[in-house]
Amino acid sequence: MSAVSRIATLTRQSMLSALSDNNRLRLFSGSSNPSLSQEVARYLGMDIGPMLRKRFADGELYIQIQESIRGGDVYLIQPCCHPVNDNLMELLIMIDACRRASARQITAVLPYYGYARADRKTAGRESISAKLVANLITGAGAQRVLAMDLHSAQIQGYFDIPCDHMYGSPVIIDYLKSKQLTDLVVVSPDVGGVARARAFAKKLNDAPLAIIDKRRQSHNVAEVLNLIGDVDGKTAVLVDDMIDTAGTLSEGSRLLRAQGARQVYACATHAVFSEPAINRLSGGLFEEVIVTNTIPVPDDHHFPQLTILSVANLIGEAIWRIHEESSVSSMFR
């Protein structure tokens, strides 16, 4: 049985057809990941709503919703990935346009939440940008947020509106199970990711857990110090929420191999892939790098070990459940 329970397709499509006629449930896509939005729309059996998007000569963005959404339940899909500032501003303008068009309910769907790592002060006179982004989204007029794999769970509490939290792990776990790997050990790349790795291991038939003790010297620079757990002769699965420069994972893979790991897989929901991630990931340290399509991966960032899985059905199911006032959290139990 799939990780996502699904309402019968024909029933759903017939219901959505009637709903769409009344402009009740409407789906719109920003420009950051249109292919994901189209997949979500196909799952729901509906079309992406028409929207005019253009830039003025000075770089300012113009958005116009090109159909009536008065009284509608509107969902705006826009991961705030690179270029994060442009994509965030586009989302805010989309929300504002829908609010001024008298949408009954506006849900910001954020497959990737930009600025999530700035979730607390680690030094004096710093901004907590993750909270600022939450304030901006709320202030623009969103009444609900649907986010996937937030860097830290407490970001949900930064919102004064409902925030539904999804996880990309079900599609990754289903894929790993299909490979029938043996002698698995799930590895957290740092102490902060232990809860995520433990939940991941539980879904993989209670696989054993190992932890890499890491101390970060500066932003995007990590030093691996020690391994807690046994990986000798085993297939190690490194689990994280995102891959940025891949420094943590590549150093982790070296440590795991030095400790006797037979194979090393890297799994993450968000493929940020900042330089020099591609060189690190494609250099032979990993049997496979498994990510999802919350962030679009350009063709020139593909490499032989890369596998990209779709989370569109998860997002589509969550949207449907919110619209029907059903449980979202039960999808991930």
Curated annotation (Swiss-Prot):
Q: In which pathway does it act?
A: Metabolic intermediate biosynthesis; 5-phospho-alpha-D-ribose 1-diphosphate biosynthesis; 5-phospho-alpha-D-ribose 1-diphosphate from D-ribose 5-phosphate (route I): step 1/1
At which positions is Mg(2+) 2 bound?
D190
Q: Which GO terms describe its molecular function?
A: ATP binding; kinase activity; magnesium ion binding; ribose phosphate diphosphokinase activity
Residues annotated to bind ATP: D58, G59, E60
> Gene Ontology terms, cellular component aspect?
cytoplasm; ribose phosphate diphosphokinase complex
The record's remark on the cofactor is: Binds 2 Mg(2+) ions per subunit.
Q: Tell me the GO BP annotations in alphabetical order.
A: 5-phosphoribose 1-diphosphate biosynthetic process; purine nucleotide biosynthetic process; ribonucleoside monophosphate biosynthetic process
Q: Which InterPro entries match?
A: PRib_PP_synth_CS (IPR000842), Pribosyltran_N (IPR029099), PRibTrfase_dom (IPR000836), PRTase-like (IPR029057), Rib-P_diPkinase (IPR005946), Rib-P_diPkinase_bac (IPR037515)
What coarse category fits the chief subcellular location reported for this protein?
Answer: cytoplasm
**SUPFAM superfamilies reported in the protein's UniProt record:** PRTase-like
Please give the cofactor(s) recorded in the UniProt entry for this protein: Mg(2+)
Q: Which residues cross the membrane?
A: none
Q: Which reaction is catalysed here?
A: D-ribose 5-phosphate + ATP = 5-phospho-alpha-D-ribose 1-diphosphate + AMP + H(+)
**Which class of enzymes does this protein belong to?**
transferase
Q: Which UniProt keywords apply?
A: ATP-binding, Cytoplasm, Kinase, Magnesium, Metal-binding, Nucleotide biosynthesis, Nucleotide-binding, Transferase
Q: Its family?
A: Belongs to the ribose-phosphate pyrophosphokinase family. Class I subfamily.
PANTHER family (UniProt xref) = RIBOSE-PHOSPHATE DIPHOSPHOKINASE FAMILY MEMBER (PTHR10210), RIBOSE-PHOSPHATE PYROPHOSPHOKINASE 1, CHLOROPLASTIC (PTHR10210:SF41)
- What does the record note on quaternary structure? Homohexamer.
Descriptive protein name: Ribose-phosphate pyrophosphokinase
Name its species: Synechocystis sp. (strain ATCC 27184 / PCC 6803 / Kazusa)
